[in-house]
Structure formats: C-alpha cells, structure tokens
UniProtKB/Swiss-Prot annotation:
Similarity annotation: Belongs to the RuvA family.
Gene name, Swiss-Prot/TrEMBL: ruvA
Domain comment as written in the entry: Has three domains with a flexible linker between the domains II and III and assumes an 'L' shape. Domain III is highly mobile and contacts RuvB.
One of the GO BP terms on file: DNA recombination
Origin species: Clostridium botulinum (strain Alaska E43 / Type E3)
Signal sequence annotation: none
UniProt region (Domain I), positions on chain: 1-64
Domain III as annotated region, ranges: 154-198
Protein name: Holliday junction branch migration complex subunit RuvA
Length: 198
C-alpha cells in the first residue's frame, strides 16, 4: 500500500519514529541504524515503508534506504523471524556487517539479535546465503567490524533515555557523537550525562 513517506521528522521513541505529513503523524517502527541517522526535529526526511497487517495488528515499518528495507523483507521470509527480531538484526550492526555474517555463516553474530537462537540463526544462514549475491561479499569485507564497534541500537536507546530526562534531541545527539560506542547502554548514558552536566 505504501512505497515511502516523505514528511517532517517529529521525534523518536524506543522502537519507532514519528513523521508528520499533511497534518497526520505516522508511527513508523524502525531499526537502530535508521534511528541513529535521523536529522533534527522538523527537518524533511524520506522513509521507505513496508506495511504489516495481521488480525490483531497493523503497523508501518520504515527504513532510510531501499537496501535496508529489502533486507528486512528477506528476514521476514524466514520461518520464526518476526518483525521485532528482524529489526533487532538490522540494529546490532551496519547492514553490510549483517550480510557478511550471513554469507560467511557467522551464527554467533546473528545470535546477538533479540529472539534469535542458534536454530533460527542457522536457518537464516541456510535460506539467505544463496539469495545474497556472492559479489556482495567483497563489498562487505572492507566494512565489516565487530558489532561492539558500531552499537547503533545502544546509541538509539541512550538517545531516548536522555530525551526522557529532559534534554533536547539536539543536545543528546551532540554528546553521543563523542562517547565510546563500544560501551553498554548504561555506560554510554553515564558518559553522556557527565558531558551534559560538565
């Protein structure tokens, strides 16, 4: 039904962003990676959309790139992988890191995702390894690093926590740029608070 939504970025919550278009605020669930790339409130953005309709739920899932949206759809095609687990996998590291892990059979990397056990990780690798183009491996190698070096999910959670404490999104984003991104959410928040109160 939806291909993409263009509008003003209005804010972030734990697992979704809000985009206003023609007076309507759209609640869009997204990955930590897309959350961490959001501009300041009020700026125009374009988010590619997948609508999920179930008997008890209708939701919009959006991403900053078609590539990330396509990966989300691929993950949903795996039996046992729901939207929440797919978003978690897209949040633990950059997209190329995830592809690299699938292509090389790195179950340990995939198991870092919420709700992803060894059995499902193995199924993801088995079913998606051949669907991801082999030449993508070369593109992924140069960008692959340990997930703790690109902890976008922790950053998005830290951002939400700082905003809930009364800091503006701009203030929070500014200090989070300088924190050690390999730390846990708790330590990232502590470091940010030291900078904000200093």
């Amino acid at each position: 039904m939806y291909e993409y939504i263009k509008g003003e970025y209005m804010g972030i919550n734990k697992d979704y962003i809000i985009i206003e278009n023609n007076g309507i605020g759209y609640k869009i669930f997204t990955s930590g990676a897309t959350m961490s790339s959001m501009p300041c409130c009020g700026e125009k953005i374009k988010i590619y959309i997948e609508q999920i309709v179930r008997e008890d739920f209708i939701g919009l899932y959006g991403f900053e790139s078609l590539e990330e949206l396509d990966m989300f759809k691929l993950l949903l095609s795996i039996n046992g992988v729901g939207a929440k687990a797919a978003l978690s996998l897209l949040s633990i590291s950059r997209l190329n890191n995830l592809k690299y892990a699938i292509i090389t059979g790195d179950e340990k990397h995939l198991c870092r995702g919420t709700g992803i056990g060894k059995k499902i990780a193995g199924r993801i690798i088995l079913e998606l390894k051949d669907k991801l183009k082999s030449d993508e491996l070369l593109n992924c190698i140069d960008e692959f690093d340990d997930v703790t070096q690109d902890n976008s999910l922790a950053l998005s959670e830290a951002l939400s926590a700082l905003i809930s404490l009364g800091y503006t999104e701009k203030e929070a984003e500014k200090v989070l740029k300088d924190v050690d991104k390999s730390e846990s959410v708790e330590n990232i928040i502590k470091s940010a608070l030291v900078k904000l109160m200093g």
